[in-house]
Amino acid sequence: PQRLRPLIPEIRARMSELLGEAVEVVRARFGGRLSYASVPLDGVDWGPFDIIATDAGYRTAAMAARFGDDIRAFVAQGKAQGKPVAVTEFGCAAFRGAADMANRGDIVEWGDGARPVGFKGEYVRDEEEQARYIRELLDVFESEGVDNVFVYTFARYDLAYRSASEDFDLASAGLVQVIQGGRGQRYPDMRWEPKAAFHALAEFYRALDASQR
Protein backbone atom coordinates (compact mmCIF):
# COMPACT_ATOMS: atom_id res chain seq x y z
CA PRO A 1 0.00 0.00 0.00
CA GLN A 2 1.06 3.55 -0.75
CA ARG A 3 0.95 4.58 2.92
CA LEU A 4 3.65 2.03 3.76
CA ARG A 5 6.17 3.27 1.19
CA PRO A 6 7.82 5.79 3.57
CA LEU A 7 8.52 2.92 5.97
CA ILE A 8 10.40 0.76 3.47
CA PRO A 9 13.89 2.24 4.07
CA GLU A 10 13.55 1.73 7.83
CA ILE A 11 12.21 -1.80 7.36
CA ARG A 12 15.12 -2.68 5.07
CA ALA A 13 17.67 -1.27 7.51
CA ARG A 14 16.21 -3.23 10.41
CA MET A 15 15.99 -6.35 8.25
CA SER A 16 19.66 -6.11 7.30
CA GLU A 17 20.61 -5.59 10.94
CA LEU A 18 18.61 -8.65 11.98
CA LEU A 19 20.09 -10.80 9.21
CA GLY A 20 23.60 -9.66 10.09
CA GLU A 21 23.07 -10.75 13.69
CA ALA A 22 21.59 -14.06 12.52
CA VAL A 23 24.62 -14.74 10.31
CA GLU A 24 26.96 -14.26 13.28
CA VAL A 25 24.97 -16.75 15.34
CA VAL A 26 24.85 -19.32 12.54
CA ARG A 27 28.53 -19.03 11.60
CA ALA A 28 29.48 -19.77 15.21
CA ARG A 29 27.81 -23.16 14.81
CA PHE A 30 27.90 -23.95 11.09
CA GLY A 31 30.84 -24.06 8.70
CA GLY A 32 29.00 -24.20 5.39
CA ARG A 33 27.95 -21.47 2.99
CA LEU A 34 25.06 -19.22 3.96
CA SER A 35 22.29 -17.51 2.05
CA TYR A 36 18.83 -16.07 2.56
CA ALA A 37 15.81 -16.64 0.32
CA SER A 38 14.88 -13.01 -0.23
CA VAL A 39 12.14 -11.06 -1.96
CA PRO A 40 12.83 -7.69 -3.65
CA LEU A 41 11.22 -5.70 -0.84
CA ASP A 42 13.79 -7.01 1.65
CA GLY A 43 16.67 -4.97 0.21
CA VAL A 44 19.19 -7.39 1.71
CA ASP A 45 22.80 -6.40 2.41
CA TRP A 46 24.50 -9.42 0.87
CA GLY A 47 27.88 -8.65 2.42
CA PRO A 48 27.64 -11.26 5.21
CA PHE A 49 26.29 -13.98 2.89
CA ASP A 50 28.03 -16.38 0.53
CA ILE A 51 25.21 -16.80 -2.00
CA ILE A 52 22.74 -14.21 -3.28
CA ALA A 53 19.29 -15.78 -3.41
CA THR A 54 15.73 -14.83 -4.31
CA ASP A 55 12.30 -16.41 -4.01
CA ALA A 56 11.13 -14.11 -6.82
CA GLY A 57 11.72 -16.64 -9.58
CA TYR A 58 8.15 -16.59 -10.84
CA ARG A 59 7.10 -15.38 -14.30
CA THR A 60 3.54 -14.12 -14.50
CA ALA A 61 1.78 -12.89 -17.62
CA ALA A 62 1.99 -9.33 -16.29
CA MET A 63 5.79 -9.29 -16.22
CA ALA A 64 6.69 -11.95 -18.78
CA ALA A 65 8.15 -9.40 -21.21
CA ARG A 66 10.76 -8.25 -18.70
CA PHE A 67 11.39 -11.55 -16.95
CA GLY A 68 14.60 -12.33 -18.84
CA ASP A 69 15.94 -8.84 -18.12
CA ASP A 70 15.12 -9.23 -14.42
CA ILE A 71 17.01 -12.53 -14.20
CA ARG A 72 19.94 -11.04 -16.14
CA ALA A 73 20.12 -8.15 -13.66
CA PHE A 74 19.97 -10.59 -10.76
CA VAL A 75 22.91 -12.57 -12.16
CA ALA A 76 24.83 -9.34 -12.76
CA GLN A 77 24.32 -8.43 -9.10
CA GLY A 78 26.03 -11.64 -8.11
CA LYS A 79 28.90 -11.13 -10.53
CA ALA A 80 29.44 -7.59 -9.23
CA GLN A 81 29.85 -8.97 -5.72
CA GLY A 82 31.77 -12.07 -6.76
CA LYS A 83 29.08 -14.39 -5.42
CA PRO A 84 26.97 -17.16 -6.96
CA VAL A 85 23.23 -16.60 -7.31
CA ALA A 86 20.31 -18.90 -6.63
CA VAL A 87 16.62 -18.79 -7.52
CA THR A 88 15.17 -20.49 -4.47
CA GLU A 89 11.57 -20.67 -5.64
CA PHE A 90 9.75 -20.98 -8.98
CA GLY A 91 6.96 -23.03 -10.50
CA CYS A 92 3.20 -23.05 -11.01
CA ALA A 93 0.19 -25.28 -10.40
CA ALA A 94 -1.26 -27.89 -12.77
CA PHE A 95 -4.43 -26.23 -14.08
CA ARG A 96 -5.11 -24.42 -17.33
CA GLY A 97 -4.06 -20.80 -16.95
CA ALA A 98 -1.72 -21.46 -14.03
CA ALA A 99 1.38 -20.38 -15.95
CA ASP A 100 0.03 -16.85 -16.33
CA MET A 101 -0.72 -16.66 -12.59
CA ALA A 102 2.38 -18.51 -11.28
CA ASN A 103 2.67 -17.93 -7.52
CA ARG A 104 -0.56 -15.90 -7.52
CA GLY A 105 -2.60 -18.92 -8.53
CA ASP A 106 -4.46 -19.68 -5.29
CA ILE A 107 -7.76 -21.02 -6.61
CA VAL A 108 -8.79 -22.97 -3.51
CA GLU A 109 -11.52 -22.22 -1.00
CA TRP A 110 -10.18 -23.11 2.44
CA GLY A 111 -12.24 -24.35 5.36
CA ASP A 112 -11.57 -24.92 9.03
CA GLY A 113 -8.16 -26.28 9.92
CA ALA A 114 -6.68 -25.04 6.63
CA ARG A 115 -8.49 -27.83 4.79
CA PRO A 116 -9.43 -27.38 1.11
CA VAL A 117 -13.20 -27.51 0.63
CA GLY A 118 -13.71 -26.27 -2.91
CA PHE A 119 -12.54 -24.06 -5.77
CA LYS A 120 -13.11 -20.38 -6.51
CA GLY A 121 -14.29 -21.23 -10.02
CA GLU A 122 -14.18 -23.89 -12.73
CA TYR A 123 -10.68 -25.17 -13.51
CA VAL A 124 -9.31 -27.85 -15.83
CA ARG A 125 -6.32 -30.02 -14.92
CA ASP A 126 -3.36 -29.34 -17.22
CA GLU A 127 -0.12 -31.03 -16.22
CA GLU A 128 1.50 -30.17 -19.54
CA GLU A 129 1.10 -26.45 -18.88
CA GLN A 130 2.90 -26.84 -15.56
CA ALA A 131 5.67 -28.90 -17.19
CA ARG A 132 6.06 -26.44 -20.06
CA TYR A 133 6.31 -23.50 -17.65
CA ILE A 134 9.07 -25.20 -15.67
CA ARG A 135 11.00 -26.11 -18.84
CA GLU A 136 10.77 -22.56 -20.16
CA LEU A 137 12.03 -21.04 -16.93
CA LEU A 138 14.83 -23.57 -16.63
CA ASP A 139 15.95 -22.53 -20.11
CA VAL A 140 15.99 -18.87 -19.03
CA PHE A 141 17.88 -19.58 -15.82
CA GLU A 142 20.45 -21.72 -17.62
CA SER A 143 20.99 -19.27 -20.48
CA GLU A 144 21.37 -16.30 -18.12
CA GLY A 145 23.85 -18.08 -15.86
CA VAL A 146 21.90 -18.68 -12.66
CA ASP A 147 24.04 -20.98 -10.50
CA ASN A 148 21.33 -22.84 -8.57
CA VAL A 149 17.55 -23.18 -8.87
CA PHE A 150 14.89 -24.79 -6.69
CA VAL A 151 11.46 -25.75 -7.98
CA TYR A 152 8.52 -25.07 -5.68
CA THR A 153 7.68 -27.76 -4.69
CA PHE A 154 8.02 -31.55 -4.58
CA ALA A 155 4.64 -32.29 -2.98
CA ARG A 156 1.67 -30.52 -1.39
CA TYR A 157 0.16 -33.00 1.04
CA ASP A 158 -2.55 -30.50 1.94
CA LEU A 159 -3.74 -30.45 -1.68
CA ALA A 160 -4.25 -34.14 -2.37
CA TYR A 161 -6.20 -35.90 -5.08
CA ARG A 162 -9.30 -37.39 -3.43
CA SER A 163 -11.47 -38.17 -6.45
CA ALA A 164 -12.20 -36.79 -9.91
CA SER A 165 -14.61 -34.29 -8.34
CA GLU A 166 -12.18 -33.38 -5.55
CA ASP A 167 -8.90 -33.11 -7.43
CA PHE A 168 -7.25 -30.50 -5.25
CA ASP A 169 -3.86 -31.49 -6.63
CA LEU A 170 -4.57 -29.47 -9.76
CA ALA A 171 -4.12 -26.40 -7.53
CA SER A 172 -0.79 -27.73 -6.26
CA ALA A 173 2.60 -26.65 -7.56
CA GLY A 174 3.95 -30.05 -6.54
CA LEU A 175 5.98 -32.12 -8.97
CA VAL A 176 3.99 -35.14 -7.81
CA GLN A 177 0.28 -35.76 -7.31
CA VAL A 178 -0.43 -36.70 -3.71
CA ILE A 179 -3.14 -39.38 -3.54
CA GLN A 180 -5.31 -39.33 -0.45
CA GLY A 181 -5.96 -42.84 0.82
CA GLY A 182 -4.17 -44.47 -2.09
CA ARG A 183 -0.85 -45.32 -3.70
CA GLY A 184 0.86 -44.38 -6.94
CA GLN A 185 1.15 -46.64 -9.99
CA ARG A 186 4.76 -45.91 -10.94
CA TYR A 187 5.94 -46.25 -7.34
CA PRO A 188 3.34 -48.46 -5.59
CA ASP A 189 4.96 -48.00 -2.20
CA MET A 190 4.49 -44.23 -2.36
CA ARG A 191 1.44 -42.05 -1.71
CA TRP A 192 2.09 -40.04 -4.83
CA GLU A 193 2.33 -40.26 -8.60
CA PRO A 194 4.87 -38.27 -10.69
CA LYS A 195 3.31 -35.50 -12.76
CA ALA A 196 4.46 -34.33 -16.19
CA ALA A 197 6.52 -31.62 -14.46
CA PHE A 198 8.45 -34.31 -12.54
CA HIS A 199 9.52 -35.92 -15.80
CA ALA A 200 10.22 -32.55 -17.47
CA LEU A 201 12.61 -31.62 -14.66
CA ALA A 202 14.39 -34.98 -14.87
CA GLU A 203 14.68 -34.78 -18.65
CA PHE A 204 16.09 -31.24 -18.52
CA TYR A 205 18.90 -32.15 -16.17
CA ARG A 206 19.55 -35.47 -17.90
CA ALA A 207 20.09 -33.59 -21.16
CA LEU A 208 22.14 -30.87 -19.47
CA ASP A 209 24.38 -33.45 -17.83
CA ALA A 210 24.91 -35.24 -21.15
CA SER A 211 25.81 -31.96 -22.90
CA GLN A 212 28.47 -31.13 -20.33
CA ARG A 213 30.33 -34.44 -20.51
Residues covered by each model-derived region:
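Glycoside hydrolase catalytic-domain groove-lining segments
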Residues: 9, 13, 21-24, 28, ...
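Aromatic-rich peripheral "rim/lid" segments of glycoside hydrolase catalytic domains that contact
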Residues: 129-132, 140, 144, 150-213
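Polysaccharide-binding and catalytic clefts of secreted carbohydrate-active enzymes
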Residues: 1-21, 25, 39, 99-100, ...
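Generic alpha-helical secondary structure signal
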Residues: 13, 17, 65, 69, ...
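A conserved mid-domain beta-alpha-beta active-site/ligand-binding segment of alpha/beta enzyme cores
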Residues: 121-125, 131
